[in-house]
Amino acid sequence: MIQIRELLNETSPNNFTPEHLCALHEQVFSKVYPWAGKFRKVDIAKGDTLFLKHQQIASELKILFSNLANANFLKNTTPTEFSEAIGNFIIHLNLIHPFREGNGRIQRLLVWQIAKNAGLTLDWQSV
């Protein structure tokens, strides 16, 4: 399993897509889960939260990442604007919950990359 720290040190991509999200998941979890990097094929819930039906994952991620691209991947935003926009992005991505396991770790890694690409630094300690 590749260490997330190693990925944090890599250059962030300029383009974020559902395929990039899958690639991150596969890089991190390929030695743990045989389905790493692939969208879940079952419906799941955590507590009282029912996540998006698995048949809708690909289409909803396409919309979510298209909206991010239309916002120029949040480049040239103030820290406040970035926080609000990325907060909404995380809410939607979490409700989609594309993978059976590892969603939170991959979300944080992706958000860190988006922030880095936008010229910002995240401090997860203060979140």
What are the functions of these language-model segments?
Residues M1-V127:
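FIC/Doc superfamily catalytic core
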